[in-house]
Amino acid sequence: MNKLLLLLAACAGPALAGGSNYGIVPGALPQVQGKVTEWPVPTPKFARDPAPGPDGNIYIAVMSGNRIARFDTKTKTFKEWDLPDGARPHGLLVDAEGIVWYTGNGNGTIGRLDPKTGNVTSHRAPSGGDPHT
């Protein structure tokens, strides 16, 4: 019993409550100063995981829309590419040549989009599962 009381006394201090899976909780960051501007994605169906490209544009996985979107940071416009049926892109990254690689969470693939040509290719994941980022 004395050991338990000693342990509880050693652990005494402020208790933390709340939180999130992403490590950011309300009030955790200092006040952000400046102007925030938002642009709605043309297909607002679970747009997620934005990633910058080497051209300065932002690429976005539109999971439920089965598309990849690009936001042109100069013209402030969007372009979208359809993906193979059921791909449901979960996440993406853009390589140094500007090729977009995405995980096809819905059809068990790793996909490749060349934004210059619009060509999309996909490869079955060895596990056959639902790949994530």
Label each PLM-derived region with a short phrase.
Residues 29, 68-71, 110-113:
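Hydrophobic/aromatic beta-strand positions that recur at structurally equivalent sites within the blades
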Residues 42-55, 85-99, 128-133:
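Beta-rich, blade/repeat-based domains predominating
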Residues 2-8:
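Sec-dependent signal peptide recognition
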Residues 58-64, 100-106:
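Conserved beta-strand positions in repeat-built beta-propeller and related beta-rich domains
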Residues 23-45:
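A short helix->beta-strand "capping" segment at the edge of beta-propeller domains
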Residues 72-76, 114-118:
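Short loop/turn segments that connect beta-strands within beta-propeller blades
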Residues 8-17:
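Hydrophobic h-region of N-terminal signal peptides that target proteins for export
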Residues 37-40, 77-82, 119-124:
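A short beta-strand motif characteristic of beta-propeller blades
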